Structure formats: structure tokens, C-alpha cells
């Protein structure tokens, strides 16, 4: 597994807690509160340490239950993995571009929004912004609300007056930082919230001595970057590689 993929996985393991299980060399990240979200339900690590063990592959697929989930196909994965997943009925999914930046200061940003670090009084507001931005069910709110208190995560909220406008978080461990959980309330888009949140998180990571800053988002489609992709580039992150995905759609009982 590439070092950037390892950072991403290490960041999310404390978020999933016991819902993250190992099946051989694979890690199954399971979010039963959001069974139709392949963004939250993923299998990572298959075939990266050697040839694919088909028994372990089938065990990992079984462990995901009836959720809609992605299976990550690392650039370093065994070449047979994609075909084995296709043979089991998994469809092509949306790959994720991994980005990296060094320890240079963040570009300046102008916004009327106020950036605050999340505390006990703003946990629920932060969780609501993130869940709403990704179209996730209310059942996911307690899961998101626990993230700012999870090991090594630091969460920030952008406020328009007293109204939550955007949210994001950064995981910091030794010299690595992972940027994730970013979302904006639709009516507050275009106000510079995510830019200001990037700047705040970069500042926090640099203050902690981080030298490798990592994030990811959906790969380019039709050559047109999303607003998330543009913001990532704007704040100094450089494209590194795409982790492809195979998708198994949600199975309704």
C-alpha cells in the first residue's frame, strides 16, 4: 500500500472503531447507518501485499453485508484484482484522486465567515453540515458527531453570523495530516468557507510539525474538476495518483 493510502486508512480507523474489521490483508470499513453510501462503506488493501487470495476476497465481500460499497483497487494492487471483482458482478465505480502537499503556508483567503474549532456546543451543528452535504441519513448524525472527539481528529466550523455554513476536519499523527469531512450548506456556497477551512487546517497541521499533508476527492470526470477538486489544487495540493474502485450496489432486503 502506498504511503498516502496508508495515511488515509490510518485516519479513518479510529472513526470506524469496531465497525472496521480485517479480513486477511484487507480492511472492511463498514457504516451500517448509511447502507447506501459507498463513500462510507469500502474495502481497502486487497492484493497490495501479493497475489489476491480469493477466499479472503470473498470473505471481505461477505463482511460488507448488503450495503452499497466500493472495493479500492490500489495502483500497486495485483493485476488480477479488477478482473476478479468484475467476475463477481461488481461494477466500475468512481475513482478517488489522492493529493499531497508539503509544509508551505496556506494562501491567504478573504471571507466574511468566522472559522471556529468545534467544541461540545457545536458538535451537532458540525455533524449536521457534513451529513447534509453528502446527502446522508439522519441515522449517521451520531457517527459524525463522534468524529471531532475521535483520536487525532480536529474539526472546524465556518459560521455566517450564528448560522453554520461549512465544516471540515483534519487528522494529525506525528508528521502526517489527512484532510477530510468537508461539506458546505448549499445556500452558503461561494462564500469562501472551504478555502478558509483549508487555511485553518493547514495552519493547524504545520503548527503540529506535519510535513506530509494528504487529501482525496473524486477523480476528474469528462475533464471538468469539481469545486472540491479546484479548492484542493488552489490550496497547494498536487495530484499524485488515482485509486480506482469497483462498486457493489445496495441490496435491498
Stretches with model-predicted labels:
Residues 12-24, 66-68, 93-96, 147-157, ...:
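A short helix-loop-beta-strand connector motif used in the catalytic cores of GNAT acetyltransferases and
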Residues 137-187:
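A conserved beta-strand-loop-helix scaffold within acyl/acetyltransferase catalytic domains
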Residues 1-7, 42-49, 96, 105-143, ...:
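Short amphipathic alpha-helix that is part of the acyltransferase structural core
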Residues 19-24, 77-91, 152-168:
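Conserved beta-hairpin
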Residues 48-114, 118-119, 215, 221, ...:
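Acyl-donor-binding surface of acyltransferase catalytic domains
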Residues 53-61, 181-184, 190-207, 230, ...:
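Conserved acetyl-CoA-binding loop-helix of GNAT-fold acetyltransferases
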Residues 36-48, 175-186, 245:
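Conserved acetyl-CoA binding element of GNAT-fold acetyltransferases
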Residues 1-63, 144:
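N-terminal charged segments
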Amino acid at each position: 500500500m502506498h504511503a498516502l493510502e496508508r495515511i488515509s486508512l490510518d485516519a479513518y480507523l479510529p472513526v470506524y472503531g469496531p465497525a472496521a474489521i480485517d479480513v486477511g490483508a484487507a480492511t472492511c470499513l463498514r457504516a451500517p447507518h448509511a447502507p447506501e453510501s459507498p463513500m462510507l462503506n469500502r474495502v481497502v488493501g486487497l492484493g497490495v501485499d501479493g497475489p489476491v487470495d480469493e477466499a479472503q476476497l470473498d470473505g471481505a465481500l461477505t463482511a460488507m453485508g448488503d450495503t452499497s460499497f466500493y472495493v479500492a483497487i490500489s495502483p500497486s494492487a495485483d493485476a488480477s484484482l479488477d478482473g476478479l471483482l468484475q467476475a463477481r458482478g461488481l461494477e466500475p465505480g468512481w475513482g478517488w484522486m489522492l493529493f499531497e502537499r508539503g509544509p508551505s503556508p496556506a494562501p491567504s483567503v478573504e471571507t466574511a465567515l468566522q472559522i471556529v474549532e468545534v467544541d461540545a456546543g457545536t458538535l451537532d451543528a458540525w455533524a449536521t453540515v457534513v451529513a447534509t452535504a453528502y446527502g446522508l441519513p439522519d441515522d449517521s448524525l451520531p457517527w459524525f458527531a463522534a468524529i471531532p472527539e475521535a483520536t487525532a481528529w480536529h474539526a472546524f466550523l465556518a459560521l455566517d453570523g450564528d448560522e453554520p455554513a461549512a465544516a471540515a476536519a483534519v487528522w494529525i499523527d506525528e508528521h502526517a495530516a489527512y484532510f477530510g469531512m468537508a461539506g458546505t450548506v448549499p445556500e452558503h456556497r461561494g462564500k469562501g468557507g472551504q478555502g478558509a477551512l483549508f487555511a485553518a487546517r493547514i495552519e493547524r497541521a504545520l503548527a503540529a510539525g506535519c510535513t506530509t499533508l494528504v487529501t482525496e476527492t473524486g477523480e476528474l470526470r469528462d475533464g471538468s474538476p469539481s469545486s472540491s477538486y479546484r479548492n484542493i489544487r488552489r490550496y497547494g495540493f498536487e495530484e499524485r495518483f488515482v485509486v480506482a474502485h469497483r462498486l457493489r450496489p445496495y441490496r435491498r432486503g
